UniProtKB/Swiss-Prot annotation:
Site (Stabilizes the basic form of H active site to accept a proton): 91
Keywords: Cytoplasm, Hydrolase, RNA-binding, tRNA-binding
UniProt name for this protein: Peptidyl-tRNA hydrolase
Gene name of this polypeptide: pth
Catalytic site: 19 (proton acceptor)
GO molecular function term, any single one: tRNA binding
tRNA-binding recorded as keyword: yes
GO biological process: protein quality control for misfolded or incompletely synthesized proteins; rescue of stalled ribosome
GO cellular component, one term: cytoplasm
Native source organism of the sequence: Dehalococcoides mccartyi (strain CBDB1)
Family: Belongs to the PTH family.
Reaction(s) the record says it catalyses: an N-acyl-L-alpha-aminoacyl-tRNA + H2O = an N-acyl-L-amino acid + a tRNA + H(+)
UniProt-listed Enzyme Commission number(s): 3.1.1.29
Family matches, as NCBIfam families: pth
Compartment(s): Cytoplasm
Length: 189
């Protein structure tokens, strides 16, 4: 079984934010695989299904981003899974908008949702699918970063992200069916 967690903030006011590309990717992946988020469990909206022979659970934590680890920890215990059984779909400021990167482990890279997961489950050894959202303009002080991640995508940027979300959903399917090495070789750009 694989547990796929999309990171984001709950609520309609956040749905189009850069910080919510994890939720957006999971929504697309769920739709393509006829999975609905029809359950509430472990501080999350969840749905389950199968990809080939692999059972999967999709989860969108309903905590705010900075508390995502609480939901992930509960989900791991509920399904009796290890950190190596999870895939976290997240936004990444350090990647140009639309770029994807799959990797196992590593630091949180300044992402508070990932930091919360690492703290609450006690390890950083889980797979991440990072979707680039780019950095705010030149000066990179705290207020600009917050405004950037909580801002919505505009015009041309929105088109780039829609394409990236579609590719990220493909990457998830490839990751589940063919493994990290194959998916990384195909989708890391």
């Amino acid at each position: 079984m694989k547990l796929i967690i999309g990171l984001g903030n709950p609520g309609k006011e956040y749905s189009g934010n850069r910080h919510n590309v994890g939720f957006q990717c999971l929504s697309r992946f769920a739709k393509e695989n006829h999975i609905s988020f029809d359950k509430k469990c472990c501080l999350s909206r969840t749905g389950s299904g199968r990809i080939n022979d692999e059972e999967i659970v999709l989860a969108k934590p309903q905590t705010y981003m900075n508390l995502s680890g609480k939901a992930v920890n509960q989900l791991l215990r509920r399904y009796n899974l290890k950190a190596t059984d999870i895939i976290v779909v997240q936004d990444d400021l350090d990647l140009p908008a639309g770029k994807l990167r799959l990797r196992l482990g590593g630091s949180a890279g300044g992402h508070n949702g990932v930091s919360s997961i690492i703290t609450d489950i006690g390890t950083k050894e889980f797979i991440r699918l990072k979707i680039g959202i780019g950095k705010p303009d030149a000066r990179n002080n705290g207020a600009e970063v917050v405004d950037h991640v909580l801002g919505n995508f505009g015009g041309e940027e929105r088109e780039i992200i829609e394409t990236a979300i579609a590719r990220a959903a493909e990457a998830l399917a490839c990751l589940i069916t063919s493994g990290l090495d194959t998916a990384s070789n195909r989708f890391n750009c």
